[in-house]
């Protein structure tokens, strides 16, 4: 395949360590980052982290803060209103996946740089140049701005709710399926397949898989392993110029569930369930994946997430329609109701 131009979007610098939030002014100086800043953060816990960041900004820095709870197009518009008022040099996204997605999409739309400062390791959006924003035509990732820099404080991430940490593991293990789907599309549809980016995504999944052996014993070491996997996955997407290395049929299932059951379930949790199901379809040992996830307290049954059997089955039957241009193990026609029900029961997602 001849491509005239392939642009790789990657962060300029990644800072990972313990208590490094106190060194933010040093990092900003190294990168030539100056105020005014627009700080996008969440409420409650993430706002407390944002306050600590503010305390350690360069002396006399000018800034404005906006708090958001969701990742909708309306939230993006709210950020853009403040952008017009403040005219910031850079955006700082301090929070979980929703905050960072809104920040990077607003940065993209307004041609601004942004710094990613995650407060939880819930998914690989902390690095990637793509965002999941509700209110667009479909619940899939859209092009956004890659972070200029990422500042990851392991002490902070280790204190995030365990459910968010587990969701990050579920999201990353899903790359096992994404890469297999990509290979399948290359073989059957002649789609471009990047060996290096696929290998990087697969390595991230294997790293997260190893994390399931460690996280219960040593939370800080486990979180460090997980964050490295999440960063690698995001880098793979930046290199590929698409979400292909990190999003396959397991993500299509997750997006389908989000259409049917839009509240109360974490993206990474749905990807974890989708990974178990799609591993079965690919002929991978799904039982090992399920058992590893279960041992860390990951919800491996639909009812644990408040999902009905019908929602799971319906999601499986419509998953292939979410991104019809993205060929996966689900094929062009998807699964019939009876096939979807059988697979969901065999993999113990439903009883």
Curated annotation (Swiss-Prot):
Any one of the GO BP annotations: phospholipid biosynthetic process
Main location: cytoplasm
Binding site for NAD(+): 97-101, 119-122, 128
Enzymatic reactions: sn-glycerol 1-phosphate + NAD(+) = dihydroxyacetone phosphate + NADH + H(+); sn-glycerol 1-phosphate + NADP(+) = dihydroxyacetone phosphate + NADPH + H(+)
E.C. numbers: 1.1.1.261
Compartment annotation: Cytoplasm
Pathway per the UniProt entry: Membrane lipid metabolism; glycerophospholipid metabolism
Molecular function GO labels: glycerol-1-phosphate dehydrogenase (NAD+) activity; glycerol-1-phosphate dehydrogenase (NADP+) activity; metal ion binding
Cofactor comment: Binds 1 zinc ion per subunit.
Cofactor(s) the protein needs: Zn(2+)
InterPro entries per UniProt: G1P_dehydrogenase_arc (IPR023002), G1PDH (IPR032837), Glycerol_DH (IPR016205)
Binding site for substrate: 124, 171, 255
Residue ranges that the Swiss-Prot or TrEMBL entry lists as coiled coil: none
Positions annotated to bind Zn(2+): 171, 251, 267
Cellular component terms per the entry's GO annotation: cytoplasm
EC class (word): oxidoreductase
Keywords tagged on the record: Cytoplasm, Lipid biosynthesis, Lipid metabolism, Metal-binding, NAD, NADP, Oxidoreductase, Phospholipid biosynthesis, Phospholipid metabolism, Zinc
Keyword presence, tRNA processing: no
PANTHER family, A to Z: GLYCEROL DEHYDROGENASE (PTHR43616), GLYCEROL DEHYDROGENASE 1 (PTHR43616:SF5)
Described function: Catalyzes the NAD(P)H-dependent reduction of dihydroxyacetonephosphate (DHAP or glycerone phosphate) to glycerol 1-phosphate (G1P). The G1P thus generated is used as the glycerophosphate backbone of phospholipids in the cellular membranes of Archaea.
Subunit structure: Homodimer.
Family indicated by similarity: Belongs to the glycerol-1-phosphate dehydrogenase family.
Descriptive protein name: Glycerol-1-phosphate dehydrogenase [NAD(P)+]
Organism: Saccharolobus islandicus (strain L.S.2.15 / Lassen #1) (Sulfolobus islandicus)
Gene: egsA
